[in-house]
Amino acid sequence: MRARFGDRAPWLVETTLLRRRAAGKLGELCPNVGVSQWLFTDEALQQATAAPVARHRARRLAGRVVHDATCSIGTELAALRELAVRAVGSDIDPVRLAMARHNLAALGMEADLCRADVLHPVTRDAVVVIDPARRSNGRQRFHLADYQPGLGPLLDRYRGRDVVVKCGRPPSGRR
């Protein structure tokens, strides 16, 4: 492989392995095209909402205008594409935002995307979906105080709005 692809070989191997993992986690979001055209990093894939969860949430938000304020690679937006009146996505990371734009285009979907800090709202009347970072130093965090940004500042910033916050739970036996 290295002989054929040179310095790109490790990236191609990593992409192939990630897409295999993504097929199980995200495959049902894109039944016609699969995830073979999607872009993500290992960390982004780990943090991405699993397809069944994203679809369940999308059904609960059907008929609403929804702003995914931490859209990352676009998983929630992909689930919302046929159910929300309008879906808006934002993320502070320009690379993940570019991945979201690419991934949604692979599904034939256009979405309103912009670079923004979750603590600086860019919509007014939309339901806000927030998935704060729950990893640091490569480890998953389960205490609300460890989320970045913290839930206190998030809820203060979106006071009076309908907000959906994704919170992880520790595996059984861990607290």
Give residue ranges: language-model regions.
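SAM-dependent transferase fold signal centered on methyltransferase-like domains
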Residues: 1-175
